[in-house]
């Protein structure tokens, strides 16, 4: 199962999945990507 959560540290609109993933990894998550109509950075990891 994959858990997802909005990044606490990502600022501004999410336009790069790579940048989002890097921020998520710094927060202790496995990665992340831009998601939804508002392009929020969502972090992911196994749970």
UniProtKB/Swiss-Prot annotation:
Q: Return the Gene3D superfamilies for the record.
A: Knottin, scorpion toxin-like
Q: Which SMART domains match?
A: Knot1
Q: Which InterPro entries match?
A: Defensin_plant, Scorpion_toxin-like, Scorpion_toxin-like_sf
| Swiss-Prot/TrEMBL keywords | Antimicrobial, Disulfide bond, Fungicide, Plant defense
State the SUPFAM superfamilies in the record. Scorpion toxin-like
Pfam families named among the record's database cross-references: Gamma-thionin
Disulfide bond residue pairs: 3-47, 14-34, 20-41, 24-43
Q: Which GO terms describe its biological process?
A: defense response to fungus; killing of cells of another organism
Record function comment: Inhibits protein translation in cell-free systems.
Protein family per UniProt:
Belongs to the DEFL family.
Q: What is this protein called?
A: Defensin-like protein 1
Taxon lineage:
Eukaryota, Viridiplantae, Streptophyta, Embryophyta, Tracheophyta
């Amino acid at each position: 199962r994959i858990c997802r959560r909005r990044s606490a540290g990502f600022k501004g609109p999410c336009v790069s999945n790579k940048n989002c993933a890097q921020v998520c990894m710094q927060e202790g998550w496995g990665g992340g990507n831009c998601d939804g109509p508002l392009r929020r950075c969502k972090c992911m990891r196994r749970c």
